């Protein structure tokens, strides 16, 4: 009986050990990043939007990544014991459902199983997100001092959780309608018909889902980073600078979410602003201006977070790498993306033809679509989130941490300039080198976590909040 009790205790400690669960998710992500190029239909560099196969591959990595962020945020903020246990014990079920869904995605004979497994995984994730949200709401009442210290970061994490949750529900509604239509839901079906019909509604819905989810996730990462840096230790002036940036990001998240909501569930068409050229083709899409506000808020927070850079070289390099991912993302999205939007009479929104129905440089627009999805919407969020894990959990292994940051800094700079070259020449070679360096960094990070987690002083099971 004692032996059985000891065995159960070991399994309990294993399943509730955040570091072990982080290792599992990182290993899962690393494996799929490595085998991705050989999966059927997965083509990293193909002009235009992601194919269905590429979208499936993208979600295979990014959904576990979002789970990883929930796990980390729950531990970082010291949310309720029940919530943290629920998240930790969900690690392997989420990974297993994702794996099986990916395997069953390819054969036509198993697509129904794929739909069921991925739907189960998505509902599970939504339940975890709701638990996370509820416990976030409780935090100011459970620990008023912590809330006062990090109110700006807390507000951004809370709002981005809501925004990402709405985007997730949009994705689920889209999948249901895409598979079955809405005839079985008369009230919704009547609205869909009034909003322009099934295909119009589905198009608006999937656009809102994809355009809202990643800015919300990146905004959440900024909030988590502020807490991870320990910005509450700053002087009041510098702390207020960080809080100002976080509030700017909150405003951008709310306005972005509102725009995508009314453009999905209604007839509102998101306009462009500051238009010019034939048919008003040149101009900044209003939704892009709002997602840009989130990024601007992130850049403002850097001004204050700079003063928290560590004197330890390895720690400092990790912190600099984190901030660099934000800067690189904004450089691509604003520096390249905005410039193209104000010259759509040439780029043609990625459509061949002449203005206002297309443009001679449409292929370069398609190159940007592919390049920025891979860099700014894929590898940069991955790096930004995973770096926070290193910052929080890995305090030793200075050699490995320095090596990791060298790969990240090089990959981020080369990858960012690679997007620009892709847009200018249609050559994706430089960007591919940058992305390869970032993937190597993730593999080394996974190895370092394995090494750290297996040490005797590794993190034990989930502990009560202080």
Task: Locate the predicted segments by residue.
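Cytosolic juxtamembrane helix and N-cap/initiation of the first transmembrane helix
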Residues: 2-28, 150-155, 316-327
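Membrane-interface interhelical loops and short amphipathic "cap" helices
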Residues: 38-56, 105-120, 179-204, 265-286, ...
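Cytosolic-side membrane-entry/anchor segment at the start of a transmembrane helix
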Residues: 113-127, 312-317
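Hydrophobic alpha-helical transmembrane segments
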Residues: 6-9, 36-42, 64-76, 148-151, ...
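Hydrophobic cores of alpha-helical transmembrane segments in multi-pass integral membrane proteins
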Residues: 19-43, 54-78, 85-108, 120-140, ...
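Interfacial loop-to-transmembrane junctions
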Residues: 146-151, 237, 282-289, 317-318, ...
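Short, charged juxtamembrane terminal tails flanking transmembrane helices
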Residues: 2-4, 454-466
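Membrane-interface helix-boundary motifs at transmembrane edges
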Residues: 11-15, 78-87, 141-152, 231-238, ...
């Amino acid at each position: 009986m004692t032996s059985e009790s000891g065995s159960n205790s070991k399994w309990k400690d294993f399943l509730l050990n955040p570091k072990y669960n982080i290792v599992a998710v990182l290993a899962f992500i690393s494996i799929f990043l490595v085998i991705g190029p050989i999966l059927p239909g997965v083509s990293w560099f193909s002009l235009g939007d992601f194919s269905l196969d590429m979208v499936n591959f993208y979600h295979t990595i990014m959904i576990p990544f979002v789970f990883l962020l929930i796990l980390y945020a729950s531990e970082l903020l010291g949310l309720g014991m029940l919530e943290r246990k629920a998240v930790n014990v969900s690690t392997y079920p989420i990974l297993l459902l994702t794996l099986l869904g990916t395997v069953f995605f390819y054969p036509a004979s198993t697509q129904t199983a794929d739909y069921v497994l991925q739907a189960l995984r998505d509902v599970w994730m939504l339940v975890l997100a709701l638990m996370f949200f509820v416990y976030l709401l409780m935090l100011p009442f459970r620990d008023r001092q912590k809330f006062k210290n990090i109110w700006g970061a807390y507000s951004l994490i809370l709002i981005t959780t809501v925004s990402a949750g709405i985007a997730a529900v949009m994705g689920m509604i889209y999948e249901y309608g895409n598979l079955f239509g809405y005839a079985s839901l008369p009230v919704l079906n009547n609205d869909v018909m009034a909003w322009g019909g099934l295909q119009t509604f589905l198009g608006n819905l999937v656009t809102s889902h994809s355009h809202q989810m990643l800015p919300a996730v990146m905004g959440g990462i900024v909030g988590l980073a502020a807490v991870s840096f320990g910005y509450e230790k700053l002087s009041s002036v510098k702390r207020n600078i960080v809080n100002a940036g976080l509030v700017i990001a909150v405003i951008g998240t709310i306005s972005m979410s509102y725009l995508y909501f009314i453009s999905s569930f209604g007839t509102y068409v998101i306009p462009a602003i500051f238009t010019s050229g034939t048919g008003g083709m040149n101009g900044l899409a209003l939704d892009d201006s709002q997602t840009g506000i989130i990024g601007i808020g992130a850049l403002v927070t850097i001004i204050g977070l700079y003063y928290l850079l560590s004197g330890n070289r390895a720690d400092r390099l990790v912190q600099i790498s984190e901030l660099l991912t934000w800067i690189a993302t904004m450089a691509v999205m604003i520096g390249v993306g905005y410039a193209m939007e104000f010259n759509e009479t040439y780029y043609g929104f990625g459509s061949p033809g002449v203005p206002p129905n297309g443009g001679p440089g449409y292929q370069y627009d398609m190159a940007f679509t592919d390049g920025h999805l891979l860099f700014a919407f894929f590898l940069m969020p991955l790096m930004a989130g995973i770096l926070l894990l290193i910052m929080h959990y890995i305090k030793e292994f200075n050699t490995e941490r320095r090596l990791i940051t060298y790969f990240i800094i090089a990959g981020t700079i080369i990858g960012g300039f690679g997007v620009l070259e892709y847009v200018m020449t249609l050559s994706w070679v430089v960007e591919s080198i940058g992305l390869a360096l970032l993937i190597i960094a993730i593999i080394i990070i996974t190895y370092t976590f394995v090494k750290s987690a297996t040490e005797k002083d590794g993190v034990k099971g989930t502990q009560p909040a202080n």
